[in-house]
UniProtKB/Swiss-Prot annotation:
Quaternary context: Part of the 50S ribosomal subunit. Forms a cluster with proteins L3 and L19. In the 70S ribosome, L14 and L19 interact and together make contacts with the 16S rRNA in bridges B5 and B8.
Source species, domain of life: Bacteria
CDD domains per record: Ribosomal_uL14
UniProt keyword annotation of rRNA-binding present: yes
Protein name (database record): Large ribosomal subunit protein uL14
Keyword 4Fe-4S: no
Free-text function comment from the UniProt entry: Binds to 23S rRNA. Forms part of two intersubunit bridges in the 70S ribosome.
């Protein structure tokens, strides 16, 4: 579960390496976010020459969490790290590549471009 001030690794080649959560979108007073939820974040670390610069405020979708997510069949999916992909307002990724596996829950939330770019969908 991701909340305000949580730091996440960026799983794309947009130029950002690490982001810090500012706000969880979707309802007033919402405290936590899980896989497939959109957050507003600021870039804390960035690579030189990238599309995204340090200090920039961006929207991102969570693709991996340590706490994991429960599925309809009763199984759980957990990952080794918390990671997100930086997106535009139309839910398309700002980068052109996705690194590492992503959860199947993204398909249910209509992030089709991220699912198609990902090397593995779990």
């Amino acid at each position: 579960m991701i909340q305000q001030e949580s730091r996440l690794r960026v799983a794309d080649n947009s130029g950002a390496r690490e982001i810090l959560t500012i706000k969880v979108l979707g309802g007033s007073g919402r405290k936590t976010a899980n896989i497939g939820d959109v957050i507003v974040a600021t870039v804390k670390q960035a690579t030189p020459g990238g599309v995204v610069k340090k200090g920039e405020v961006v929207k991102a979708v969570i693709v991996r969490t340590k706490s994991g997510a429960r599925r309809a069949d009763g199984s759980y999916i957990k990952f080794d790290e918390n990671a997100a992909v930086i997106i535009r307002d139309d839910k398309s990724p700002r980068g052109t590549r996705i690194f590492g596996p992503v959860a199947r829950e993204l398909r249910e939330n209509n992030f089709m471009k991220i699912v198609s770019l990902a090397p593995e969908v779990l």
